[in-house]
């Protein structure tokens, strides 16, 4: 069987997906946060499907890690006009890595809660990790995050001069 030998199959999968994604100049929303990622992703997928029909791609289930995200992006086809993907994490640096693969045009941080404390030293560290998706945006990207969250300033700083859209319970 013909094949290509690579030293790291996960890195190769990520690089392949990033290269594939780069061929599609479409809006791509990346959703991250401690809680509610899948729900928000599916809500956005419903909106995109109402707008674009089958021309919208979305994460299925919670394919949100270094295997699932590349597999989702490799489903992109010329018919697609928009996409929404979920980014999950359980260790430092994972959101930045996944964001580099996804190349989002819109990044949404849902929240930061006490999760993965075995890998993250504090909830503030979780907020920084989740906010890495904002730093990955190009300068014309859109950063979306909660206005009434105690970590709002972290996300403002990470999104820097990019357009910011805030949401609130109040």
Which residues does each PLM region occupy?
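P-loop NTPase switch/communication element
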Residues: 59, 66-82
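Acidic, Mg2+-coordinating active-site environments of NTP-dependent enzymes
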Residues: 106-170
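Switch II (G3) loop of P-loop NTPases
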Residues: 81-92
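Residue-level signal for inorganic ion chemistry
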Residues: 16, 31, 69, 86, ...
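Switch II of P-loop NTPase G domains
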Residues: 90-101
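Short, basic phosphate-binding NTP loop
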Residues: 1-32, 39-45, 49-51, 67, ...
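Short conserved AdoMet
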Residues: 49, 77-78, 103, 138-139, ...
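Short beta-strand-centered segment that lines the nucleotide-binding/catalytic pocket of NTP-utilizing
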Residues: 53-67, 111
């Amino acid at each position: 069987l013909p094949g290509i030998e690579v030293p790291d199959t996960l890195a190769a999968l990520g690089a392949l997906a990033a290269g594939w994604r780069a061929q599609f100049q479409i809006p791509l929303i990346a959703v991250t946060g401690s809680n509610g990622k899948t729900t928000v992703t599916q809500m956005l997928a419903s909106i995109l499907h109402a707008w674009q029909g089958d021309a919208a791609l979305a994460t299925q289930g919670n394919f949100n890690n270094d295997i699932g995200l590349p597999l989702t992006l490799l489903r992109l086809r010329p018919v697609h006009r928009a996409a929404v993907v979920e980014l999950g994490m359980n260790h430092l640096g994972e959101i930045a890595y996944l964001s580099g693969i996804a190349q989002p045009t819109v990044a949404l941080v849902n929240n930061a809660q006490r999760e993965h404390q075995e890998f993250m030293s504090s909830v503030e560290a979780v907020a920084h990790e989740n906010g890495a998706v904002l730093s990955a945006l190009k300068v014309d990207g859109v950063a979306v995050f909660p206005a009434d969250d105690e970590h709002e300033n972290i996300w403002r700083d990470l999104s820097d001069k990019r357009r910011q859209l805030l949401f609130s319970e109040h």
